[in-house]
């Protein structure tokens, strides 16, 4: 699921100082790539050092630009303590604010829900609290969490999903509801795993707006704690508020970026074997926010002559 920020901020609200900021996009070096000759003489590329002291070339791989953020900030101006949220994502997010300490300022209305849905690419005023008559400067301590998506979302596609690969190609489904092995959580219960060779073209199953991309990981494996976060993926927001997730994509193969509007059937990336994965495949799921929790929803694919195909473990899926 999309990561959630949970910072605790404690600042003394006083005079507002405006400072011009210089912004630089500096790539972070996330992984090391080892290049060496294997036992058979072929070149080996790995995130793990060779087992002996043989000659090896090591390269630091750039981690790519920073991911969008959701932040809450406050200021004291015109006798009021003001809190505002910024959503940098090209998708709505749900945000919950918790006030842990508040001094020398009015308290929010106890009936006010400190829960908001922030529109995509937006700045939202959360609250404005008047200073009390005491001489002290207002002080606030707060915590916030957020999750992608609008909890009012209802899954309502206008047609079956397109199989997420080239027309006339067919690949086996290795995991689909209800015959699940690793898809045990709500976020993956209705996900579909499709076995395909590394480098197979991945196409959008439904049109929408790209809002998250991770494409610089190159490793895969069966260690959940180490490998789960290393999956390359694309997330595309649909018109009904759900989003499509395409995961385990190949390194440096993603052809879209956040903010791009993609059409159904558009070539978006190549399949791979990155992240927590036992072999090359595409993990596809449609997900919605159900109130600070995510769940995958059942999908059907378009078959021949407009028919509907329910994905099933052990069957072939063909793109039309």
Regions flagged by a language model, labelled:
Residues 1-11:
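N-terminal secretory signal peptides that target proteins for export/translocation
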Residues 2, 29-125, 134-139:
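Short, cationic interaction patches enriched in Lys/Arg with P/S/T/G and frequent prolines
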Residues 15-25:
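Bacterial N-terminal signal peptides
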Residues 114-230:
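Surface-exposed, glycine-biased beta-strand/turn segments
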Residues 158-174, 203, 226-229, 254-263, ...:
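Acidic, glycine-rich catalytic/binding loops that coordinate metals and/or anionic ligands
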Residues 197, 203, 238-265:
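Short histidine-centered loop motifs in beta-beta connectors
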Residues 217-226, 271-283:
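Active-site loop architecture of trypsin-fold serine endopeptidases
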Residues 234, 263-275:
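Short hydrophobic beta/alpha edge segments that flank linear recognition/processing sites
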């Amino acid at each position: 699921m999309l990561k959630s920020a949970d910072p605790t901020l404690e600042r003394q609200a006083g005079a507002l100082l405006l400072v011009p900021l210089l912004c630089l996009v500096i790539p972070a070096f996330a992984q090391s790539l080892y290049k060496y000759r294997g036992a058979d003489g072929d070149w080996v590329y790995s995130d793990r050092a060779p087992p002996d002291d043989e000659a090896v070339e090591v390269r630091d791989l750039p981690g790519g630009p920073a991911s969008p953020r959701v932040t809450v900030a406050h200021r004291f101006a015109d006798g009021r303590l003001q809190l505002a949220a910024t959503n940098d994502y090209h998708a709505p997010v749900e945000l919950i604010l918790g006030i842990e300490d508040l001094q020398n300022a009015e308290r929010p209305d106890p009936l006010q829900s400190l829960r908001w849905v922030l529109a995509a690419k937006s700045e939202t005023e959360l609250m404005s609290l008047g200073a009390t008559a005491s001489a002290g400067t207002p002080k606030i301590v707060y915590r916030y969490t957020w999750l992608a998506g609008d909890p009012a979302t209802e899954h309502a596609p206008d047609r079956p999903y397109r199989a997420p690969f080239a027309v006339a190609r067919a690949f086996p489904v290795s995991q689909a509801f209800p015959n699940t092995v690793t898809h045990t959580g709500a976020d993956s219960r209705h996900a579909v795993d499709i076995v395909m060779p590394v480098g197979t073209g991945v196409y959008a199953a439904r049109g929408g707006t790209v809002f998250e991309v991770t494409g610089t990981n190159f490793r895969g494996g069966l260690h959940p704690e180490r490998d789960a976060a290393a999956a390359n993926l694309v997330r595309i927001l649909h018109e009904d508020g759900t989003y499509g997730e395409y995961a385990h994509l190949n390194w440096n193969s993603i052809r879209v970026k956040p903010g791009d509007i993609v059409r159904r059937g558009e070539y978006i990336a190549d399949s791979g074997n990155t992240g927590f994965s036992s072999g090359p495949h595409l993990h596809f799921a449609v997900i919605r926010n159900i109130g600070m929790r995510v769940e995958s929803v059942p999908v059907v694919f378009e078959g021949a002559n407009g028919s509907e195909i329910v994905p099933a473990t052990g069957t072939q899926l063909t793109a039309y």
